[in-house]
Amino acid sequence: MNLNLYGHAGKWLMVDCGVTFEKRGAINIVQTADPSFIAERRDQLVGLVVTHAHQDHLGGIHLLWDQLECPIYASPFTRHVLQSKLRRERCGAPVVEIPPGENLTLSPFHLEWLPVTHSTIESSALLISTEAGKVLHTADWKIDPNPVVGEAFDKNLWHSKLSEPVKAIVCDSTNATRPGHSLSEDELYEGLDQAVASSKGRVVVGCFASNIARLDTLA
């Protein structure tokens, strides 16, 4: 799960509000982060920004909404996924659409959305600026030269945006501590194509429903 808070000049910015993945057993359990710190200061909370449309980044919003009640910002695709979930959960939280590549000021924070490659559409990192300096919040990312969905890693864009030093990089990437490089999603197509072509019957493939890149590969 993900829930990050950035504070400056008596104000707070929240980035993502997710849940853990279900643990199957006698009782199916999902968990959210403990919101008590920011719930006690919600009059200082200027907004919640959702980086991408995965449950570990947005799945806790309907559960914690009555303790937050702040503006929510997301890209068009992320907003669509989030609103669908909110409707199912009968939560009326409004979500403001921010087109990819746009900037937003939620004083005292200035936010720049930077595209990153991930397994869903419109995933972004956030460059958060205040008078005290800049912090780069990556969210989930992958340097993939041939992504199936989304934009390829643009080295020139990142060099230009990070030409000035940042105070910190808050980095989130699954299996980032494992050595080596992950395969490009594009490299999976040939193997999947051969497996399906050689099958004499129906082929059933299981994957996360939110893995848009894998669904595109299978299609």
Language-model features and meaning:
Residues M1-V49, H54-A219:
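His/Asp/Glu-rich metal-coordinating catalytic cores
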